[in-house]
């Protein structure tokens, strides 16, 4: 018998990291330089989700570039939010659109671009990009 840990059964308590991921939401704080245009580049190299058709895991690097307005995103919250996709059945295209929509709702940036660079599967490599510009910008 192996000594490797196994997933908890319903009777076992949920691990603290799993609780943090389940509660994961995008949190913001005031932009320290409102009124100044500057770019924030964030790379999330360990993104995972599940294929909605096969159930196989998908892996990607998510690139997030934005120009903040009045708020910036807290990085630990962003990490937990992204980790919440791990067991979710979602297409590559929908991943990028959901992340973009949630990011815009939380941070209301002047401009934002989300790029999902998904690892090749079956000799096919896919990159999905979506953008948003704040109205009136």
Curated annotation (Swiss-Prot):
> EC number(s) of the enzyme?
1.7.1.13
Where along the chain is substrate bound? 73-75, 92-93
Which controlled-vocabulary keywords does the entry list? Cytoplasm, NADP, Oxidoreductase, Queuosine biosynthesis
Involved pathway(s) = tRNA modification; tRNA-queuosine biosynthesis
Highest taxon of the lineage? Bacteria
Cite the InterPro entries for this sequence.
GTP-CH-I_C/QueF (IPR043133), NADPH_dep_7-cyano-7-deazaG_red (IPR050084), QueF (IPR029500), QueF_type1 (IPR016856)
Q: Which GO terms describe its molecular function?
A: preQ1 synthase activity
Q: Where in the cell is it found?
A: Cytoplasm
Name the NCBIfam families on file. QueF-II
What is known about what this protein does? Catalyzes the NADPH-dependent reduction of 7-cyano-7-deazaguanine (preQ0) to 7-aminomethyl-7-deazaguanine (preQ1).
Family (UniProt):
Belongs to the GTP cyclohydrolase I family. QueF type 1 subfamily.
Q: What is this protein called?
A: NADPH-dependent 7-cyano-7-deazaguanine reductase
Organism encoding this protein: Gloeobacter violaceus (strain ATCC 29082 / PCC 7421)
């Amino acid at each position: 018998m192996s000594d490797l840990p196994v997933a908890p059964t319903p009777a076992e308590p949920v691990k603290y990291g799993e609780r943090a991921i389940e509660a994961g939401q995008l949190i913001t704080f005031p932009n320290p330089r409102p009124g100044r245009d500057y770019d924030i580049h964030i790379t999330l190299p360990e993104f995972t989700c599940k294929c909605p058709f096969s159930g196989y895991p998908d892996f990607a690097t998510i690139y997030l570039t934005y120009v903040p307005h009045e708020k910036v995103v807290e990085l630990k919250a962003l990490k937990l939010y992204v980790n919440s996709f791990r067991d979710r059945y979602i297409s590559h295209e929908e991943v990028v659109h959901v992340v973009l929509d949630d990011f815009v709702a939380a941070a209301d940036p002047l401009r934002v671009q989300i790029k999902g660079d998904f690892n090749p599967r079956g000799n096919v490599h896919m990159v999905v990009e979506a953008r948003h510009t704040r109205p009136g910008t």
